[in-house]
Amino acid sequence: MRMSAKAEYAVRAMVQLATAASGTVVKTDDLAAAQGIPPQFLVDILTNLRTDRLVRSHRGREGGYELARPGTEISIADVLRCIDGPLASVRDIGLGDLPYSGPTTALTDVWRALRASMRSVLEETTLADVAGGALPEHVAQLADDYRAQESTRHGASRHGD
């Protein structure tokens, strides 16, 4: 999965907003500074998030943004779909419409499994989970497994493998 910078910034901004006390409005410049996001780029991102009703904006001198719902009710998938569209696609073609035949026919099921796996992680992980550092158990286990594989892989490559 390749995530655009815009989507990654959006997730970071939303997690940052999830750390604000309920009813607290965060100014765009403060949000940009907290996450190192270019302010003008963040304005565009927040506009998309507002259009999809993931954030609420407040005008005026004391204005800013807040989550439209509690962080426990907004998944990482919600944010990514708002910014980048579907979670996984192959050349922007529906999986049922891929022109696979013969020995490549089963690839459609590989892409389905990939999409289901990503969807499971991204839909079940909320902004509050990330902000609180307490990921769902299966997500934390997948992350631990990945770190172990990386450690093994990098250790093996250092020893000439």
Curated annotation (Swiss-Prot):
One of its GO terms (cellular component) is cytosol. The lineage of its organism: Bacteria, Bacillati, Actinomycetota, Actinomycetes, Mycobacteriales. GO terms for biological process: regulation of DNA-templated transcription. The keyword Cytoplasm does not apply. The keyword Cell membrane does not apply. NCBIfam families: rrf2_super. This is Putative HTH-type transcriptional regulator Rv1287. It comes from Mycobacterium tuberculosis (strain ATCC 25618 / H37Rv). Keywords: DNA-binding. Was identified as a high-confidence drug target. It comes from the Bacteria. GO terms for molecular function: DNA binding; DNA-binding transcription factor activity. SUPFAM superfamilies: Winged helix' DNA-binding domain. Residues 2-132 form the HTH rrf2-type domain. InterPro entries: TR_Rrf2-type_CS, Tscrpt_reg_Rrf2, WH-like_DNA-bd_sf, WH_DNA-bd_sf. Pfam families: Rrf2.
